[in-house]
Amino acid sequence: MEETIKDPPTSAVLLDHCHFSQVIFNSVEKFYIPGGDVTCHYTFTQHFIPRRKDWIGIFRVGWKTTREYYTFMWVTLPIDLNNKSAKQQEVQFKAYYLPKDDEYYQFCYVDEDGVVRGASIPFQFRPENEEDILVVTTQGEVEEIEQHNKELCKENQELKDSCISLQKQNSDMQAELQKKQEELETLQSINKKLELKVKEQKDYWETELLQLKEQNQKMSSENEKMGIRVDQLQAQLSTQEKEMEKLVQGDQDKTEQLEQLKKENDHLFLSLTEQRKDQKKLEQTVEQMKQNETTAMKKQQELMDENFDLSKRLSENEIICNALQRQKERLEGENDLLKRENSRLLSYMGLDFNSLPYQVPTSDEGGARQNPGLAYGNPYSGIQESSSPSPLSIKKCPICKADDICDHTLEQQQMQPLCFNCPICDKIFPATEKQIFEDHVFCHSL
């Protein structure tokens, strides 16, 4: 097997993983005569795109990986892949690099990833034989050849079965190898992380060691200072022991004073108890006074509420009284108006109001005794009784067609319901709405 200066890209990809149909080899002979150059013709399929480091190698039939090439040639990239002629390419192998034996070989197209994209039919490198020679064989030789052929077929089948078994084992081994490679990559990654962690830990320990050394030096210096400090504290302790003796003596004196103070405290406690009892009685008295005051305030509030209600009612009565007074004045004005109207009518009839025997009563009782339907009586009743006028002098009433002119205006006013005028806003209410009138007047006082 011969190699060039730069080896092509290969891989350990099995035959099962290759795509032999993407590059098609054309015009491949059954055998090539040794000593001459060999031209390899091939065609790219529609969806295949060649790359710069693709190559075509000559492999012995039965090869397993692309590393088992005998010789190879780099592929020439076409300028325009869309052109039909660019799909058909060729490469020439020099006679010097071709095999010298008569084994079966084949062309294989391998891409830059080391994957086989096409393979040709097998061929040989041998001289041309005389194919026109007539060979005469006996029947026994034919049977022997047939028997030998059967044995070869059987052996071929066994070899195929063995090849399939080996391919399966190889596939399992490839899967196991892939798994081991993944585990190796994982372990390498973990190893790198651990190495990095160990380095970081080492740096941390070195830093911590330096810090501990510095702390040790500081502690040694502080230890010397503490020795001096201990001597000073011992001297202070002796002084404090003497002071403690004085304090113990003073404590005894304080204890005696405390006993005396406890006795005085007991006496004061008894006095305080008596004072608390007196204070409790005073609190009860104050509470009783507060209750009495609360009761008095409630009564005062009730009286104030009652006084307010009475004042409210008084205001309402005053308002109603004023309203009635206004109504009375209005009625008196209407009465005067009616009197003037009667005088005018009497003058129209040729009578004198002062010469009438009956005057208009000024009270409601007089009017009621004369005629319950009239408020002021009939001013013409006396005239009818005193004199009997002639039929020619009697005038007809234009309203009721009576023999005398009747005062229907007064009757119409008497038949109308009594009205109430608001003394504040002069709003008029019917006599049937007396309660509404009172509420309206009361609202003005709020």
Swiss-Prot record:
Which residue stretches are annotated zinc finger (UBZ1-type)?
419-444
Region (Interaction with LGALS8) residue spans: 371-381
Query: Could you give the domain comment from the record?
Result: The MYO6-binding domain is required for autophagy-mediated degradation of infecting bacteria such as Salmonella typhimurium, but not for bacteria targeting to autophagosomes.
The entry's localization annotation reads: Cytoplasm, Perinuclear region; Cytoplasm, Cytoskeleton; Cytoplasmic vesicle, Autophagosome membrane
Q: List the molecular function annotations (GO) for this entry.
A: protein homodimerization activity; zinc ion binding
* InterPro entries with a match to the protein in the record: CALCOCO1/2_Zn_UBZ1 (IPR041641), SKICH (IPR041611), UBA_autophagy_assoc_protein (IPR051002)
The organs and tissues expressing this protein are described as: Expressed in all tissues tested with highest expression in skeletal muscle and lowest in brain.
Span of the annotated motif CLIR: 133-136
**Can you list the GO cellular component terms from the UniProt entry?**
autophagosome; autophagosome membrane; cytoplasm; cytoplasmic vesicle; cytoskeleton; cytosol; intracellular membrane-bounded organelle; membrane
- Annotated phenotype, changing residue 378 to A: Prevents interaction with LGALS8
Family listed: Belongs to the CALCOCO family.
On assembly, the entry states:
Dimer. Part of a complex consisting of CALCOCO2, TAX1BP1 and MYO6. Interacts with MYO6. Interacts with GEMIN4. Interacts with ATG8 family members MAP1LC3A, MAP1LC3B, GABARAP, GABARAPL1 and GABARAPL2. Interacts with ATG8 family member MAP1LC3C. Interacts with LGALS8. Interacts with TOM1; the interaction is indirect and is mediated by MYO6, which acts as a bridge between TOM1 and CALCOCO2. Interacts with AZI2.
Q: What Pfam families has UniProt attached to this entry?
A: SKICH (PF17751)
> What does the UniProt function comment say about this protein?
Xenophagy-specific receptor required for autophagy-mediated intracellular bacteria degradation. Acts as an effector protein of galectin-sensed membrane damage that restricts the proliferation of infecting pathogens such as Salmonella typhimurium upon entry into the cytosol by targeting LGALS8-associated bacteria for autophagy. Initially orchestrates bacteria targeting to autophagosomes and subsequently ensures pathogen degradation by regulating pathogen-containing autophagosome maturation.
Query: What segments bear the compositional bias annotation Polar residues?
Result: 381-390
Instruction: Write the record's keywords in alphabetical order, separated by commas.
Output: Autophagy, Coiled coil, Cytoplasm, Cytoplasmic vesicle, Cytoskeleton, Host-virus interaction, Membrane, Metal-binding, Phosphoprotein, Zinc, Zinc-finger
Q: Where is this motif: LIR-like?
A: 203-206
For this chain, the Swiss-Prot or TrEMBL PTM comment says: (Microbial infection) Cleaved by S.pyogenes SpeB protease; leading to its degradation. Degradation by SpeB prevents autophagy, promoting to S.pyogenes intracellular replication.
Q: What is the effect of changing residue 425 to A?
A: Fails interact with MYO6 and to promote maturation of autophagosomes
Q: How does it sit in the membrane?
A: Peripheral membrane protein
Q: Where is this region: Disordered?
A: 362-390
Task: Write down what this protein is called.
Answer: Calcium-binding and coiled-coil domain-containing protein 2
Q: Which domain of life is it from?
A: Eukaryota
Q: What induces it?
A: Treatment with IFNB1/IFN-beta and IFNG/IFN-gamma show an increase in number and size of CALCOCO2-specific dots and partial redistribution to the cytoplasm. IFNG/IFN-gamma increases gene expression only slightly and IFNB does not increase expression.
Residue spans making up a coiled coil are 137-349
Which positions does UniProt annotate for Zn(2+) binding? 422, 425, 440, 444
